[in-house]
């Protein structure tokens, strides 16, 4: 059978039949002929026909005539590709439409069942699959039925091109024309009725439902090249959509490319030739023309959608058309199950007549993109692609919408649709009920509503599992191509518009529904989401706090203690190392938790009254009293505790300090010398340096008094230098001060002021910086900064912090300490049994209470090392030469074998 298609005579006839079509249509076909020749060279059926000769003339003539149609279609398509989008495109698309219809009529007259199944299943793939045994004869019949009046059909195609071009130009050239085609039932409903009445239900309905002229024409094009090429080129020359993708695929749907490559010997054979006799190898055609397999399988069942999806992902045919075919295959699978095909056509005819005039012209009017989707609609005459994509009338149009988006019908129309979708957002709500009504009316006009509803319910029920797989595969098919991702993103508005039809929103896009519903109700849902997010954020902040809060707390605390950072800009505090500051925030939360834990531990003694209410037991009152008294308890040097008797002295001292500061302020404001603080300073320093009173001073509020002494006078002059020096030293010697004390006393602000003051002395500034560093490190959760300390400072700090061990008293049953020297010298006799303090056992040595803080002195004399170093430096050349000489001698000694005397001479025995 391949020899029939690929015979040399057949190829010659094809070449002869194609040239008049080129002459009739345009002179631009020269370039296209060259392109065709170039395409035909690699795997053209002509070469194959030369290799594979056959003598069957009937098939040859049929294939010749069929190829004439296909070459005409190729020329039309190639002309469509190269021509500017003008009336010639319309003619070509119309020609493809008319040729589709005429070929359908011829097919209906010749072998409506077989050939239309072939066409319906895209005549390249489905003949192979619907009539695998007659796969060669039926396509031949099909091409014969088309080729019987091939020349006439071309003439009719040209005439119909003129007529439809007139119709198209009369009716917005492609919007109204397909709408009329579809609305007049002559092109849509008539074929659809033929489909319904004849076995064409599978084929044309599949064409119609399966985007017949992206899918079916893509394969009809194989058999009716004029259908396929215009269809795909209407679809592919849908001017941006597929050309971009088909240009990317280097062969408008592998089928047009193969057609062009084979000079349209039969665009079915070209595909067959390209796919190595796709009739013989239908799986290859299925692989290459996933749309061929898809329609027959769609006719067979709905589960094939999964396979078409995969095929379409794998097939390089038009990533977009393959997905259109895929989405269309869902249509076809759903619509081929019953008369819903006719209903879909009726719907699409009416809906397209209305909505294409509404949506499509609006979306496509600004450019030739009218032809893009419309050529698709026209190419399929059933206008399943464009209508289904343009109109959410069918529940499947969710998928076509995705197919339209995936096909990126045209990137420009897409953009226009985006814009129009926003512009027509007011009309969307009106259109949707209209479209729903239109959906219902065509269903009623074509057949009863219940058939579609029952079918759709059955589909939903039967395909509920398949649809999930479809959705996943759809997503994989869609997301596999970046163009499709862009298309899907760009068609978001369109999807939202399409999916707003609650009646028709099948589970095809079940996973996308919530997103698209959110898009439709974006104005409400976004506000709700914002409110929710705000409330959640507030709740989270209340429950857990936030980093900004913690940072603000630290900043506020620092501001409370040391004042605002912007008060004086003369000198900034640079006490912290960078690595310390980097770790601040991470440590603060932990430290706060530790502080909270410490507070809770310290409060363990007190039963928290907040939990128990205001009721306090006698025990709690007693604990409170005890706690209030504990502030006055101090540790003595020997570890004993005592209640300070110096509280009255401390309080009197603080009173005097405050009075002196107040008097100095008054004197300064009255322009008199303020000497009260200076006269009192020696007494204050004397008391503040008493180690046992320091904590008492701090508890009694000496920090606020020191702050009064360090603050500038009313005339902004600093207190006396001696006062500043002495008090800063005392502050440095005071034990650690709590944050609360620092905060309430205001000492931090006074010290910071001195630190930043330009007239403060450098030693005082250094002390002030150290104080600020020491006080602020606990706030940021930092430990002592040992890096900033010198060795002496570290040693001094260790000595100061060395714990004062309680010395074991020699009273009680403990062994009195004896002086070992006296025992050894005999001055003190060793204890004997019966003596007090005697132990009749070996005594365990007492643990050492020594903290080895001070490093022991190095007892080794360093002079020897120094001498060696100096001697090394002072080595003379003579010594070096002598050493070398000695080394050479040593080497030479062992340079030769040791001679052993057999007689035993010279043996060191």
Swiss-Prot record:
It is found in: Nucleus. GO terms for cellular component: nucleus. Residues 1-615, 786-820 are annotated as: Disordered. The keyword rRNA-binding does not apply. It comes from the Eukaryota. SUPFAM superfamilies: Conserved domain common to transcription factors TFIIS, elongin A, CRSP70 (SSF47676). Residues 434-443 have a biased composition (Basic residues). Pfam families: Med26 (PF08711). This is Protein IWS1 homolog. It comes from Xenopus tropicalis. The gene is iws1.
